[in-house]
Amino acid sequence: MSWIFIGLLVFFVGAAAFTALVAPLRQHSNIITRTPVVKSYIGIDDFNNTDKGVMFEAVTTPGGPADQAGLVGGDVILSFDGQPIQNEDQIEELMEKTPIGKTVDVEYIRDGQKKTAKLTTISQDENRRLTREFERRPEGRAHFGYEDGDAERVEVPGTNTYGVRLGTILRSRPADLAGVKEGDIVTAFDGVPIRTSEEFLMRVRRALPYSTVKLSIVRKGENETDPVEKLEIPVKMGKQ
């Protein structure tokens, strides 16, 4: 019986030692496989493939890399950090591989012209901080007075550029009081080129309440033969 007892004792001691050795290795393996991908952010979103590159709809992070570099929604990105971009998967993959804090060249097309900008990537935490800082600013959000769902990206008559045609203008709101009309095509908001409806919405939200902004518009006449007017309309913003 003593030999059986000794054998069992040796077996259990060995099993415990093996478990103690293997458990940390398994835990370490789980840690490795669960490590999240560290991705760089540049403050833009919602990419669309084009025949020349990748267009994005809006600068989504006020004060972020793309915003500081002067990019706006509607720009078509041709290359990122020297790498040609042909579809949205490529730029997403490149942002995953680009180190946080790296300064890169971004080649893009706006209004048919090729341009280059430099921007420095940021972390997800910094991107969230900037977004949160904007959303919680004490001044609040501005109000323009239009149905954003009715606005659409259109070609500006007689040009190779795009603007945003406004739909419903709400009565007795800032846009209406300033003389903005349904069908007006917005080409700039306080000097910022407007090429997509999403970018226009972001710029409206970013304006300070009760500030006066300059709206650049193109207005078509009632008849097809009427000349196209280019107007600069000052709009005193409201507050949401």
Where are these regions (language model features)?
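Residue-level signal for short segments within beta-strands and strand-turn junctions
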Residues: 108-110, 123, 217-219
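PDZ domains, with a preference for the canonical peptide-binding region formed by the helix
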Residues: 79-107, 188-216
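Hydrophobic membrane-insertion alpha-helices, especially the h-region
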Residues: 2-20
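PDZ/PDZ-like domain segments forming the peptide/carboxylate-binding groove
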Residues: 45-79, 84-86, 149-188, 192-195
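Extracytoplasmic
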Residues: 37-41, 51-54, 61, 72-73, ...
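PDZ/PDZ-like peptide-tail recognition elements
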Residues: 21-57, 120-164, 168, 206, ...
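Short, solvent-exposed loop/turn segments at the edges of extracellular beta-sandwich modules
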Residues: 221-223
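Solvent-exposed loop/turn segments at secondary-structure junctions
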Residues: 84-85, 113, 125-126, 193-194, ...
